[in-house]
Amino acid sequence: MLFAIGQRWISESENSLGLGIITGQDNRTVTISFPASDETRIYALASAPLTRVLFQKGDEITHQLGWKARVVDVMMRNELAFYLVQRLDNNEEIVVQEMELAHQISFSKPQDRLFSTQIDRNEHFVLRYKALKHQQEQFQSSLRGLRGNRAGLIPHQLHIAQEVGRRIAPRVLLADEVGLGKTIEAGMILQQQLLAEKVQRVLILVPETLQHQWLVEMLRRFNLHFSLFDEERCADFDNPEDHVEANPFVAENLIICALDWLVQQPKRAKQALAGEFDLLIVDEAHHLTWSEDSPSIAYELVMQLSAVIPAVLLLTATPEQLGQQSHFARLHLLDPNRFYSYRAFEKEQQQYQPVAKAVQSLLSEHILTVEEQNHLAELLSEQDIEPMLKVINSQADTEQKQVARGELMSNLIDRHGTGRLLFRNTRQGVQGFPHRIYHQIKLDLPTQYQNAINVLNMLGEIKDPELFYPEQIFQKMNADATWWRFDPRVDWLINLVKSLREEKILVICQDAITAIQLEQALREKEGIRSAVFHENMSIIERDRASAYFAQQEEGAQVLLSSSIGSEGRNFQFACHLVLFHLPNNPDLLEQCIGRLDRIGQRRDIQIYVPCFADTPQIRLAQWYHEGLNAFEETCPMGAILHEKCGAKLTEFLTSDTTDDFQAFIQQTHQQQLQLKSELEQGRDRLLELNSNGGEQAQQLANDIAIQDGSTELIDFTLNLFDIIGVEQEDLGEKSIVISPTGTMLVPDFPGLKEEGVTVTFDRDLALAREDLEFLTWDHPIVRNGIDLIVSGDIGKSAVALLVNKQLPTGTLLLELVYIIESQSPRGLQLTRFLPPTPLRLLLDIKGNDLSHQISFQGLQKQLKPMGKNMATKVIKIMRPAIEQLIKQSAKNVVEPAKMIIEQAKQLADQSLSAEINRLYALQAVNKNIRPEEIEQLESQRTLSLELLNQANWRLDSLRVIVSNKE
């Protein structure tokens, strides 16, 4: 390819970008600007997916100023085209440089391919039409961005994702209780925003220990490839010799890094602030300490980032756990103008308390007192609620009262103090969780361990934490010793595994080496099939271990994991958990149990803790169980109590005496009960209703389940693979291996690895086996497959034989598919209202459109393929008639195309105006409606209608049909 600045090219893979201009090139790359969509692309010279745009004599062009002209002659100078044209409005002849051509232009000439005998197979034309129809449907689907995640269909998660994901620059606090899936909610919101092109650049800040968990979750659940940033990676961008420091944060669009690292590296923090991100996600945001006088450095950094990044998601503990002051600090990060003073916030919250009590009465279906009705009238106008209150307090039937209560609750939710900013679900509110059953196994400490402890104690070589791991102390004496040959925990574990032959068992150890040694013990002693899973393994190796464990037949019965290695992995298909070592704080304990105790777990969880008598292990287990009840219930107050009692607990764990330990446990238990009671009293039922979505959320889950059960995606995708030339191998168990081949119609299938990939269309199987790709309409392989067809030349022109005894032999029909589309900047989401829409015409020899009488499928059933030689002869003979029909189709398409564009404008106006009016109404009673949100929507409405006015249409594909008697 010869490139020159000023040349006009189009992208083969992204037709919607419009007509591009070469703006720069070097030895390896070429830069091209697409003014129509306000985009710039940089391609490798050797493989740029670009097509040179050169018009020929007789072609019609459009100037940037809007006038049209016909090309009279073409001249080339220095690789640039100069067109002598005749304007269509005044017949003036003028020379136009190619740089002056209109940017909003469509290029696709199936007739050129047809007349040059580049004829596609009939099935390719059918695939193209189906791909266009599916593309249109998916752009307009309300389930887009919600159905493609490797996650169960949990109503409250889907509700939050839909509610927040459709907003412009959402700024919210996700504060669900542990185990309810805040990470999944954040991922679903992120995916919706990315698919809608509302955001492109994303920064996720997490604690250092959770970086890989987020990396795995984003990749495995959402097919999002994030980059992990640390000092080593960023140092590669520092080049003192150039005297110019490149900003590493602009090198990638999707970035995960540790918040602590940014705090410790002011230079990197400054670079992140200059990174021009669209969305910021902060996990464990409750660790950002704040007070009015001295906010922490971490808090101030997040404050600075949230000031320059439009969309912000904070994942945090529940407000009740945080306390009001800390809760205010998170809200201040999201909207400092609204939450400017803690005292004002406190006063507002106190005013809301009576309303919360009235809500409780409504939920309990009690008759509201006069005082409660007055409190509700303070939040809603009396005239708004009076009709509803009359029904609620009357002798109306139960159904009428239920409707009135529902309407009143809906109004209250919209006007709730922090309803649009805060989402918080509790296990009690969501329900559907299994029980957790604790089994303590008390064993005698082997003399080998006791002797090793005594000797190393005398030498002063034991640190307190090591007392929890006697096998490691023993190995200090003799590194080659096989401790598992005499450790009674190993024999107990083997007996447990043998007694649960049909069950899967997850065993969590503190470290990788113990997991590896236990695998050896199970294999050598009893030949038990097991897999190991730890932080020293690559993601692919962990996937394989996870898949081996998930297999029902011939799979591993036991998975032996280190505590860090299992982060981010959920094994809901198992219900037996062995804690070979106990974590040293309640949050880590909950993380371990959370591998099995997730929403969607269908069976009670059996938790086994083998401990040695009279050791720190058993005392810690006792404190967890009797003090916190942390094994059998989630313990949201665990971290608070551990911080409060930690020093005293450590004393009891490391001393030989256990005097007063029982009293200490009892004291912890009393504090736990008190905190639990306070949390329950502080529950905001109205907020919970807003957060879980009620019946609408359930309907959303049902809609996705119905689509999951449809075979439409499977039929289309397998047909797509067949035609493209992707190899398919059915493995049974609802999974297939797809691999690229050397005979594919395209040189590369985006998203399909060279070594192939195993895929499934079944959600339950995808949840059980993380090594499988879960194919949905939102999956990159499916989306890329559709793009390959609709943006390429496959199926653009075809010839077919119509077998019909009623028609004279040689009767000509021409089937044409036009695309109605609008070119617009990312983020405007015009595809909601006007996606690339196929409009089918079926013309007879007289130019009559028969498409309304004869459907695509109905016609297809009567068609037979025509050989290439015969098709070439038919085209040659019938070319004049075909050319005449193509001209006629350009007239036929005008009215229906204009109607579709008008409908899109009406839909855009109605949809955006309704949302603007709703926000204006809410703003009058709810201060959390940000003025800039309404302003953005109004600008969006104006620009959307303007660009829809400029929508146009183009001929995408055509099929010549000739009749025969047989």
UniProtKB/Swiss-Prot annotation:
Biological process annotations from GO: regulation of DNA-templated transcription
Domain Helicase ATP-binding stretches: 163-337
Molecular function GO labels: ATP binding; DNA binding; helicase activity; hydrolase activity, acting on acid anhydrides
Annotated ATP binding sites: 176-183
Cross-referenced Pfam families: Helicase_C, RapA_C, SNF2-rel_dom, Tudor_1_RapA, Tudor_RapA
Placement of sequence motif DEAH box: 283-286
NCBIfam families: PRK04914.1 (NF003426)
Family as reported in the entry's similarity comment: Belongs to the SNF2/RAD54 helicase family. RapA subfamily.
Function (record text): Transcription regulator that activates transcription by stimulating RNA polymerase (RNAP) recycling in case of stress conditions such as supercoiled DNA or high salt concentrations. Probably acts by releasing the RNAP, when it is trapped or immobilized on tightly supercoiled DNA. Does not activate transcription on linear DNA. Probably not involved in DNA repair.
Protein name: RNA polymerase-associated protein RapA
Species assigned in the record: Histophilus somni (strain 129Pt) (Haemophilus somnus)
Gene name of the record: rapA
